[in-house]
Regions:
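Sec-dependent N-terminal signal peptides of Gram-positive bacterial secreted proteins and lipoproteins
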Residues: 2-25, 380-400
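A generic structural signal for short, solvent-exposed coil/turn residues
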Residues: 17, 30-32, 74-76, 90, ...
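Generic detector of low-complexity/intrinsically disordered segments
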Residues: 7-11, 15, 162, 301-305
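Domain-terminus/edge residues, biased toward the C-terminal soluble/receptor-binding domains
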Residues: 149-150, 164-166, 171, 176-414
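Active-site-adjacent loops and short helices of periplasmic peptidoglycan-processing enzymes
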Residues: 23-191, 198
Length: 414
């Protein structure tokens, strides 16, 4: 009897445990954030894992400076020399107190821009690149559109409040996605302290300190894997923050914008943990991998992945991705090895969720020709060719006979 009761209890507890595990096997609920706009984006695929008013424009304050940093890295060498003009020393807010006529390296101004959030450094870089703040703002907006930003308008390089200076959480994430690819940006953005050496206008060193607590190991907000971030604040713009972090090849970008509370460090850590704990980056194909074969009538070739292909999936999701290959007759077109000739939609097979498009190329050349036909068409062509050849030969024979008769007639006449 006791043995039967014990067996029943073991079975009952096992049943409860299994069902509890099944019930709990779901993605954690995303954290709440106090900012009015927020996003969590995978940097590799651009997939959005969390969103809150991501397309609503807000004043971004000093998070603007990631665009200034991007344009500086794209247009300058770190050792280039900048001669400060009249206007930058007059910039309001946070500054390192540069002087008109002072000569500084681009590298030093970038450190001042990203660590001290120096508004005067931002304006000095802008004038160095474009000649004026107005022209640099045009360059900022042009580059933003190229990156896919749709609700952004910059009017200055530092984020000082202006009624028309606006961007969104999603647009900031796209800019951060681009600038964080630069090794120099990551190095500067992760530096805790830096000193600008004396210049022609300053006899003392200028010490700089990083304001980003996610890279400070003694901070309670320290986040291992953080590879860059930028804070922003003005009274009208409120608090903003943009940050990127990675675990292995999995890299996430979090943006918080227009936050009346100073909780952006805590909220960003919660967002990043939510992303890394619940999702994973899958590399499905590497560039050059044979994806599948194409076999149609007289054409057979390998279809090759044009680029590395990644997708994001929930960790608890057991499904694997499947390919939905574009239907296209390749016999009728000419192409060269390496040309993109087909694409495939990548779907998660449990819910047909489209996770991306894979571009496919050929592993060899293919030329369309009248000599490359199926058997039926070849027979028709051969028959037509023979008929025309016979007609041609008969015409020649007749022509020669006629010519011969004429010669004989002429000979007889003379």
């Amino acid at each position: 009897m006791k043995k039967n009761i014990l067996s029943f209890l073991i079975f009952f507890l096992s049943f409860v445990f299994i069902n509890s595990a099944t019930i709990n096997a779901k993605t954690s609920k995303p954290p709440s954030v106090s900012a009015d706009g927020a996003i969590l984006m995978d940097a590799q695929t651009g997939k959005i894992l969390y969103e809150k008013n991501i397309n609503k424009p807000y004043p971004p304050a000093s998070t603007t400076k990631i665009m200034t940093a991007l344009l500086t890295l794209e247009n300058c060498n770190l050792d280039d020399e900048v001669t400060v003009g009249k206007k930058p020393p007059l910039a309001d807010g946070s500054k390192i107190f540069i002087h008109e006529g002072e000569k500084l390296k681009v590298k030093d101004l970038l450190y001042a821009l990203l660590l001290e959030s120096a508004n005067d450094a931002a304006e000095a870089l802008a004038e160095h690149i474009s000649g004026s703040i107005e022209d640099f703002s045009k360059l900022m907006n042009k580059r933003a559109k190229e990156l896919g930003c749709t609700n952004t308008n910059f009017v200055n390089p530092n984020g000082l409040y202006h009624a028309k200076h606006r961007t969104t959480a999603q647009d900031l994430a796209l800019i951060m996605k681009e600038v964080s690819q630069y090794e120099d940006y990551r190095k500067i953005s992760n530096t805790i302290t830096y000193k600008i050496k004396p210049t022609n206008k300053s006899k003392k060193e200028r010490p700089l300190w990083n304001k980003n607590k996610l890279v400070q190991q003694n901070s309670k907000y320290y986040f291992k894997g953080c590879n860059g971030g930028k804070t922003g604040y003005t009274t009208q713009s409120q608090h903003s923050y943009v940050v990127s972090a990675n675990r292995g090849d999995f890299k996430l970008i979090a943006v918080l914008i227009h936050d009346s509370k100073k909780t952006f460090f805590e909220d960003s850590v919660n967002l990043l943990n939510y992303g890394f704990n619940n999702f994973e980056l899958i590399k499905m194909y590497s560039r050059g991998d044979i994806v599948t074969e194409y076999n149609e009538k007289d054409l057979s070739l390998n279809l090759i992945a044009r680029d590395d292909f990644y997708y994001i999936k929930e960790k608890i999701n057991p499904s694997k991705a499947i390919l939905n290959l574009e239907k296209k007759n390749l016999n009728s077109i000419s192409f060269h090895k390496g040309d993109t000739i087909l694409n495939a939609q990548v779907l998660l097979n449990n819910n047909n969720n489209n996770v991306g498009t894979l571009n496919l190329s050929s592993d060899r050349n293919h030329e369309t020709s009248i000599f490359k036909m199926n058997s039926e068409n070849k027979l028709i062509f051969f028959t037509i060719f023979v008929v025309f050849f016979l007609i041609f030969m008969i015409s020649i024979i007749r022509f020669r006979k006629k010519l011969k008769r004429k010669k004989q007639q002429r000979k007889y006449f003379y």
